[in-house]
Amino acid sequence: MASPSLPGSDCSQIIDHSHVPEFEVATWIKITLILVYLIIFVMGLLGNSATIRVTQVLQKKGYLQKEVTDHMVSLACSDILVFLIGMPMEFYSIIWNPLTTSSYTLSCKLHTFLFEACSYATLLHVLTLSFERYIAICHPFRYKAVSGPCQVKLLIGFVWVTSALVALPLLFAMGTEYPLVNVPSHRGLTCNRSSTRHHEQPETSNMSICTNLSSRWTVFQSSIFGAFVVYLVVLLSVAFMCWNMMQVLMKSQKGSLAGGTRPPQLRKSESEESRTARRQTIIFLRLIVVTLAVCWMPNQIRRIMAAAKPKHDWTRSYFRAYMILLPFSETFFYLSSVINPLLYTVSSQQFRRVFVQVLCCRLSLQHANHEKRLRVHAHSTTDSARFVQRPLLFASRRQSSARRTEKIFLSTFQSEAEPQSKSQSLSLESLEPNSGAKPANSAAENGFQEHEV
């Protein structure tokens, strides 16, 4: 009969009422987190607010499509809401003063629901934005079906509705409660089921925390595990799409398409600007996957630990690991909302230049057609000057060749074109359904390119 000894050995390591005050972290951790959270809060609000302004400027100046602008603005708004809703309340109720009374149940429910919804809105925005770029790069003939204004609005609406549905169970499962209350439907350790050590709460009134309610344990578990499945699906889907986009970009850079032989008009040598745009896009794609994995995974692990078994069954080592992971997971999670503007600036020299101009309140960006008008005027002046020296046949051939030359790149993020840059051949962007109807200045000239990640 070895089984009776197991509960006794387990119960000797189980936390009890004396461990409840340890849900409040040490003072030096609080002070450190104040400084870290303050820096992250300012950087997050400033960076995402500037991102909204930058995308609006780039769209107005003809450097960025409206559909991509809508995706990026909605993503930045969800990040801002994560900071405004999540960080102040979470720092106060979880880090600074976690022990409270049961009168804060409503605020606990609302905060948890809104924070969860905004967090998963950010996650799903990364998915839809990656999907839109995946179709544009890997399946250009189908791009028009997902790139229209109505389709983009539907995708953004899908993101927010799905995020609210993912967070909805927490509205019922969360509240303020003494953390060691037994879960009625949970088959825990024998000592906890037979003993009254967890049934009797201390007489102190401020020993409740914002946590899952014992009467809604099954709902809480289903919500956390379901949200984790959503995270894994998004992570694997984004990784799959980014890997395929990188393959297409690298193969096109080497002179061959993924599905067959490259068309004759795509075999010409490409400029250094186009190759740089591809390298920047590949770096951007890799950083997206790394950010989702590194910044979100610690917080997901902590949530899984909270849902794996009720707190009255936690061992001391389990409880200690949870409390150590808590500040790190929260910090990395908020960093994920700060990184998005940094990814844009890293992968685009044009975005970085306008971003600095917005922060300095000194916008000097010209319209995308400005440089082209100057080049067209310069070419027409040169052609007029040389017309008297060359036969008409050569002049007409030169003008016809100039009209056929386009500058189209693969990356959404595009650097400014130089007047003396060599003419480039068509890329995968020319295969996009709506590219043929657009003038060269919208997709070919300065600024953000058609294929953004």
Swiss-Prot record:
Extracellular side: 1-34, 90-109, 173-217, 306-323
Low complexity composition bias: residue spans: 418-435
Tissue specificity note: Expressed in many tissues, including the stomach, intestine and hypothalamus.
Pfam family of the protein (one): 7tm_1
Positions of glycan attachment: N192, N206, N212
Protein name: G-protein coupled receptor 39
Organism in which the protein naturally occurs: Homo sapiens
Database matches in InterPro entries: GPCR_Rhodpsn, GPCR_Rhodpsn_7TM, Zinc-sensing_GPCR
Positions bearing Phosphoserine: S396
Role noted for this protein: Zinc-sensing receptor that can sense changes in extracellular Zn(2+), mediate Zn(2+) signal transmission, and participates in the regulation of numerous physiological processes including glucose homeostasis regulation, gastrointestinal mobility, hormone secretion and cell death. Activation by Zn(2+) in keratinocytes increases the intracellular concentration of Ca(2+) and activates the ERK/MAPK and PI3K/AKT signaling pathways leading to epithelial repair.
Membrane-related topology note: Multi-pass membrane protein
